[in-house]
Amino acid sequence: MIALIIGMLVSLIVTLVGTPLLIRLVHKLHYGQYIRQDGPQSHLVKRGTPTLGGVVINFAILLGWASSALYRYLRSGDVPSWSAALVLFAMLSMGLLGFIDDFAKVRKKQNEGLSVGGKFIGQFIFATIYAVLALLIPTKSGFPSAQAGISFIEQPFFNFDFAGRAVAIILFVIWVNFLMTAWTNAVNLTDGLDGLAAGSSMIAFTGFGIIAFWESYHIKGGSHGGYSYAVSDPLDLTVIAVCAAVACFGFLWYNSNPASIFMGDTGSLALGGLFAALSIATHTEFLAVVLGGLYVMEAMSDVIQVGYFKMTHKRVFKMAPIHHHFELEGWTETKVVVRFWMIELIFVLLALTIFYGDWVTRSGLLFS
């Protein structure tokens, strides 16, 4: 618990101290955000607002986890886990793609950064590296960092091993690429209003922290009763998830309306990659759809809008993603953000209820 608190404090301090320093640096370099002309007219005043805030979020999570790991090593000789390294790799690699995209935008002073093809190739390379390493390299706990299948909670309901190991690896790589692409784009679409992505991510990663902590408390081979989980190094995953939540909380101090800085793709792609990796590492890929319900809602509104327009040349929403629709309906930006936070909180509470209900059922406690 002390290690967890240390990680949280370090992450909070890094964001609270580092963000204003980054704001000054970005102002000095004139690296302001470009605002799309076809968006809500109220957003045009945001042109020139410093971006690249995701750099601080990434460092806060990394340093928070590192300080926690250092404390555990000095106290008990516990070395950092492979599972934690892989999850952080997913976050930092996607964050790197986002940084390249952000940097290209501010240099060109337009809303066109990394090409769609370039971003896809980068995501494919990093997601494939993550998938292969997670599946093939053993961890100190004896459990794999990932399992060759698709899980709702812990146990896979579809196993990729049905046609041999080689096919399982290929299918798993495809599955991981889908998850990484889906979640990075979903979080990226959510990052369209001041504080929306930071606040909803704070709530979502808190949920992941609770799930990972429960899995660590009921780890297979442990002394606690009830159903146990064959998850690799869930305590490390808890620290990372909670550090992410706290980093978003600290960043929100400067990102709330009116925002002094935006996280940019550096932050949104990193958080999306981290969300995907945590769902894989905790074996909750499908539960994550509920846990990150707001991200799903934002992404699906965009998919529906584009698909329906291509078929009928009409629009379902006034503008997509859906948070812009409500702005054009007359809601203030702050009202949209706070209400969407509330929606994400409901999704997280629902996911935690499902998770706990599953544990109670598997433990045989439902009718005892």
Swiss-Prot record:
Keywords: Cell cycle, Cell division, Cell membrane, Cell shape, Cell wall biogenesis/degradation, Magnesium, Membrane, Metal-binding, Peptidoglycan synthesis, Transferase, Transmembrane, Transmembrane helix. GO terms for biological process: cell division; cell wall organization; peptidoglycan biosynthetic process; regulation of cell shape. GO terms for molecular function: metal ion binding; phospho-N-acetylmuramoyl-pentapeptide-transferase activity; UDP-N-acetylmuramoyl-L-alanyl-D-glutamyl-meso-2,6-diaminopimelyl-D-alanyl-D-alanine:undecaprenyl-phosphate transferase activity. The keyword Methyltransferase does not apply. It comes from the Bacteria. It is found in: Cell membrane. Pfam families: Glycos_transf_4. It is a multi-pass membrane protein. It is an enzyme of class 2 (transferase). Its EC number is 2.7.8.13. The chain crosses the membrane at residues 2-22, 51-71, 80-100, 117-137, 167-187, 193-213, 234-254, 271-291, 340-360. Its cofactor is Mg(2+). Pathway: Cell wall biogenesis; peptidoglycan biosynthesis. It catalyses: UDP-N-acetyl-alpha-D-muramoyl-L-alanyl-gamma-D-glutamyl-meso-2,6-diaminopimeloyl-D-alanyl-D-alanine + di-trans,octa-cis-undecaprenyl phosphate = di-trans,octa-cis-undecaprenyl diphospho-N-acetyl-alpha-D-muramoyl-L-alanyl-D-glutamyl-meso-2,6-diaminopimeloyl-D-alanyl-D-alanine + UMP. Belongs to the glycosyltransferase 4 family. MraY subfamily. Catalyzes the initial step of the lipid cycle reactions in the biosynthesis of the cell wall peptidoglycan: transfers peptidoglycan precursor phospho-MurNAc-pentapeptide from UDP-MurNAc-pentapeptide onto the lipid carrier undecaprenyl phosphate, yielding undecaprenyl-pyrophosphoryl-MurNAc-pentapeptide, known as lipid I. This is Phospho-N-acetylmuramoyl-pentapeptide-transferase. The lineage of its organism: Bacteria, Bacillati, Actinomycetota, Actinomycetes, Bifidobacteriales.
